[in-house]
Regions:
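Metzincin-family zinc-dependent endopeptidase catalytic domain
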Residues: 22-29, 72-187, 191-195, 256, ...
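Immunoglobulin-like IPT/TIG beta-sandwich domains and homologous Ig-like subdomains
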Residues: 378-448
Length: 590
């Protein structure tokens, strides 16, 4: 039995196998994951429910704060629900209840084991796991225990409330504290078997505080869950690409391999293993561009690096980083088939690297140089974006952003923009309203020399849909304490007024209040035959039209019998109104 002692897996690089996302596969070919098809008898029933085949989790009753306790509990629930909601998977979670105050991580400790997957905030000390581990400097920390066949047996997650402040309101975009739904979503990635992703805007990547790209699962995590926990026959509908990365005929370990779709979005990224091989599985069929780029040296500081081997996992500390990035190679992926695409890279230190991102701003001098992915909304225009490094060219280079719906102005050079000597290359960017949402990449080119920041700019969709139900999360969050709850689903009718949440969203009414109704009368046409009333409706619902004459204190009288709507609009002809002024109203019936 082997155990993890870090947020990422501490394993030997020589035995490592990776996929599009980063997982651990042992020498026997076993993938690190929960066995939800035929749960291992050695896994306690308090950890995995063998009847429902769901991973059970418990939330510590003493949350981060007492004032915001309910929202914090619901944020934890929402994170598990988002992972479970990825279409086409068997991944399932169920809440087991609350764990008592003072709980600790102890997965795999034969003496202290409690057979409980727990999520809690450490509030008194950064020493956890019985004092064995210090989480100082870490926002979150996940410990998993797994058997020799790589079956996860138990896992615990702790969030650091000693050194960090936490909040739950995803609309509070100015808050620089830690968003529960970002960090915990990241940690659950480790909880189910993932290491850090090399894709900048992935959830299981190095994320920024506050509300940013880490919130909501990326295409990289979607591919990961579909590969680790697929429904029967799912993988036969998805494509894969594999190959080797070589330099002078020798294997290149730890090279980043990135798949970019036809829209210019990074859909998956991985790193090559010790024999130079890589695999990008569980990708939707279609046309892709694949490229290979070096990670930054593990000896580089945070400000002198964007993504290092040690940022992915300790196993990649000695990743080969002295080779030049490649150009893109096109490939068409077909469902149920694995294509092969090999790369031969050229040795040598890249002339320049990107080691920081300047987040979008409408101010020309609001420059930043963080290691985190940035976000921009579709339809935004005249925003400055940029990349940072001490090695970037100070002239004669071009900054571009991949993908459709993007126009970018001339490159602006700001040598020594930062006190530590880093240069800035920036440009004005415009994002079309119909730009395909997803993770874009920054590219700097000078002659034949290239540098990439893969997936470090997220183009946001018109509305967030973190739980993959095709419905606007903001509406669900506004009216439901837990936006992933069954009663918040688009076709649910929690107030039992006969209208679904989706209909009430479209008409601007409150789905939790049966007295909140709205269906507009769209037109009233008077002819010799009478008055024709047309109003908005919901198919299958019953409506009654009422009218009254233009006489003071007159009462409303029904016009004809109730009508059952057959579409989004309904009509009624009132023949009695051919020669008199009348007022109309429409009432939805139970």
């Amino acid at each position: 039995m082997r155990f993890t002692t870090r947020v990422v897996l501490i394993l030997f690089a020589g035995s490592l196998t990776t996929h599009a996302f980063v997982t651990y596969v042992n020498n026997a070919g076993n993938v690190l994951r929960w066995n939800l098809v035929s749960p291992n008898p050695s896994v306690h029933t308090n950890v995995v429910n063998r009847n429902t085949k769901a991973i059970r989790y418990f939330i510590a009753s003493d949350t981060y704060s007492s004032a915001n306790r309910t929202a914090e509990i619901n944020a934890v629930r929402a994170c598990f629900a988002q992972w479970q909601s990825v279409p086409g998977t068997i991944l399932k979670f169920e809440e087991g209840g609350f764990a008592g105050p003072g709980v600790d991580i102890n997965a795999g400790d034969s003496i202290r084991a409690d057979h409980t997957n727990v999520v809690f905030w450490a509030k008194r000390s950064t020493l956890v796991n019985g004092g064995r581990d210090d989480i100082s400097g870490l926002r979150g920390y996940t410990l998993t225990a797994f058997s020799n066949d790589n079956t996860i047996l138990e896992a615990d997650i702790v969030l650091n409330a000693v050194e960090f402040e936490w909040f739950t309101d995803i609309n509070d975009t100015a808050n620089a504290s830690q968003l529960v739904e970002a960090t915990l979503l990241h940690e659950i990635g480790h909880f189910i078997g993932l290491d850090h992703s090399p894709v900048g805007g992935a959830t299981v990547a190095i994320g920024a505080p506050g509300v940013g790209a880490e919130a909501g699962l990326s295409s990289d995590e979607v591919a990961a869950v579909r590969w680790l926990y697929p429904q029967p026959f799912l993988l036969s509908t998805l494509g894969s690409v594999q190959g080797r990365v070589l330099m002078n005929g020798a294997a290149v370990f730890g090279a980043m391999v990135t798949a970019e779709n036809a829209a210019g979005n990074v859909v998956a990224g991985t790193v090559s293993r010790a024999n130079g091989s890589y695999e990008l599985p569980a990708l939707p069929p279609g046309n892709y561009k694949i490229r290979v780029t070096p990670l930054d040296p593990s000896t580089a500081s945070d400000t002198a690096s964007l993504i290092r081997g040690i940022d992915i996992a300790a196993d990649y500390e000695f990743a080969v980083t002295s080779f030049l990035p490649t150009t893109n190679k096109p490939i068409a992926l077909v469902g149920g088939l694995t294509s092969t695409l090999d790369f031969s890279v050229v040795g040598g230190n890249p002339p320049f690297r990107i080691t920081g991102i300047s987040a979008p701003s409408d101010h020309p001098d609001a420059d930043t140089g963080d290691r985190f992915a940035a976000v921009i909304s579709s339809g935004q225009s005249n925003f400055f974006v940029g990349v940072v490094s001490t090695t970037l060219p100070t002239n004669g280079a071009t900054l571009t952003v991949t993908g459709d719906g993007i126009t970018i102005g001339p490159t602006i050079f700001k040598p020594f923009r930062f006190l530590d000597g880093r240069h800035l290359l920036s440009a004005v960017i415009n994002v079309a309203a119909n730009a395909t949402p997803g993770l874009r990449s920054f590219v700097v080119q000078q002659g034949n020399n290239l540098a990439y920041a893969n997936g470090y700019l997220e183009v946001l969709p018109p509305f967030a849909d973190f739980n993959f139900d095709g419905f606007d999360d903001s509406f669900q969050r506004k009216f439901f304490p837990l936006f992933t709850a069954p009663e918040a689903r688009p076709d649910a009718d929690p107030d039992q007024d006969g209208f679904s949440n989706r209909y009430e969203h479209d008409t601007g009414t409150d789905p939790t209040n049966s007295q909140s109704l709205y269906f507009r009368i769209e037109s009233l046409k008077v002819t010799s035959a009478g008055s024709t009333i047309t109003w908005q409706s919901a198919s299958g619902k019953r409506y009654q039209v009422f009218s009254r004459p233009d006489v003071p204190n007159s009462s409303w009288q029904p016009v004809g019998l109730p009508i059952v709507a057959r579409g989004s609009t309904s009509q009624l002809l009132d023949p009695s109104a051919a020669s008199a002024i009348r007022f109309y109203r429409v009432q939805q019936l139970p």
